[in-house]
Amino acid sequence: MAPRIEAQEIETYWNIFSTRTNGGKFLNGEQAAPVLKNSGLRDDQLERVWDLADVDNDGNLDFEEFCVAMRVIFDLLNGEYADVPTTLPDWLVPESKAHLVQANRALTGKAVQFEQVEDEDDSPGLKDGFDWYMSPADKAKYEQIYQENRDMRGEVAFSALQDLYESLEVPDTDIRSAWNLINPSAGSSINKDACLAFLHILNNRHEGFRIPRTVPASLRASFERNQIDYQIDSARNNAAAQSRWATRADDETSTGRKAKFGDQYLTRLGRSGFKSAGTDFSSGAKTDAEWEEVRLKKQLAELDEKMAKVEAGVERRKGGQRDSKPALVKRELDQLLDYKRKQLRELEEGGGAAKAGGNLKSVGEDLQTVREQVEGLEGHLRSRQEVLEQLRREIEDERAGR
């Protein structure tokens, strides 16, 4: 299984990166120098590490490129490399920059071609008679796998199918032989037609047939035209193909396993859509939007911490004097309102001053005055309640992470 940068490692790099950039998106040479030199590597090695990690050649390292630089340094220190590698391994190429690496390899002629592996004619259990004919069911399955793994240009890299390789009973040498066979130009990726042919070869090898040594001339020419006659020699081979596919898919035989080619792989994919090669530095890639979400979550956590401190201070103050000024004013107004209502009720019921024989006109005037006072106090109470509610809303907004 290919190496990878684990989530915990990415988190460590993120803490270093965010601290050095103060929340920015890029790390310049001056900011990165203390971190890189702390490794103890020579200056010339660190310069080559920088050039290797700066995939887009903008003179700065974004977070993904910083992860690449740190991982290369750690691999050097741990003895994985004797010296700084001249090119990035495919698994370490940032997913968002894979197209830049592929373009650079194409321009410099550094596209990787696997070592040619000779077929072993004496491989036990393998059969002759590889058939280039693709049944409609097989072709549909190949196209589904292609759709799940193609990049934005409609091409598939060798490493994009790593999970498929692991689900097959096919040696790595045979997989690479098949790749070399349909990729004679040693490109970093192949188009749809070549991908379908590659999957067909793997399917037959999974069934127990030897990898073919050559591609038919007509098929090779159709690769160059980006068109393939998938029914090559179909009239001659159709009857034989039908007899080979006669075994039921659930039979535990080599031909039964053929029908299951890629089924486990596609089930694990769950038709999840485009899946490109490279490392997606989010334990499996974060986009710029996702890293922005990380930054915002960090800021939110800081605001929550500040709010917790403010609330703790409020609670401490409440311990000494429980009532804030708005609450104290509200309580006094409530008490005054209750008193005036009580006076009004006594006057209306003939108690108090009226019972003592007070002047009826005077009582009426007092009653009107009390009513006005009560209305004024109620209006004032409403206004103070609105002010209090506004204060509460502001506190809630601040607490929600404004």
UniProtKB/Swiss-Prot annotation:
It comes from Chaetomium globosum (strain ATCC 6205 / CBS 148.51 / DSM 1962 / NBRC 6347 / NRRL 1970) (Soil fungus). One of its GO terms (molecular function) is calcium ion binding. Component of the PAN1 actin cytoskeleton-regulatory complex required for the internalization of endosomes during actin-coupled endocytosis. The complex links the site of endocytosis to the cell membrane-associated actin cytoskeleton. Mediates uptake of external molecules and vacuolar degradation of plasma membrane proteins. Plays a role in the proper organization of the cell membrane-associated actin cytoskeleton and promotes its destabilization. Residues 41-76 form the EF-hand domain. Belongs to the END3 family. It is a peripheral membrane protein. This is Actin cytoskeleton-regulatory complex protein END3. GO terms for biological process: actin filament organization; endocytosis; endosomal transport. Keywords: Actin-binding, Calcium, Cell membrane, Coiled coil, Cytoplasm, Cytoskeleton, Endocytosis, Endosome, Membrane, Metal-binding, Repeat. SUPFAM superfamilies: EF-hand.
